[in-house]
Amino acid sequence: MKMIIAIIRDADSDLVTQALTAGNFRVTRIASTGGFLRRGVTTLLLGVEEGQVDAVIQILKDKCPAGPDGGKRATVFVVPVSNFLQV
């Protein structure tokens, strides 16, 4: 299992969340602030099976357009999960 942490622009968050949900991915959405100018961003948390990582990254690529200066679309971390519990 993998934990995907994706930091995206607020402007992209609704479209990305809808696309991930349509792909049957469960998403936790957190409002956050970051970057040099301290602009609002959204942090998405997804727990997925290893075989689903590429599908999530493709959705992020499709739904997060490059910035006006050709800048990054999103910052994505893929972290191994050794244990998962629901209590």
Over which residues does each language-model region extend?
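Positively charged, small/polar-rich N-terminal and surface patches that mediate targeting and assembly
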Residues: 1-87
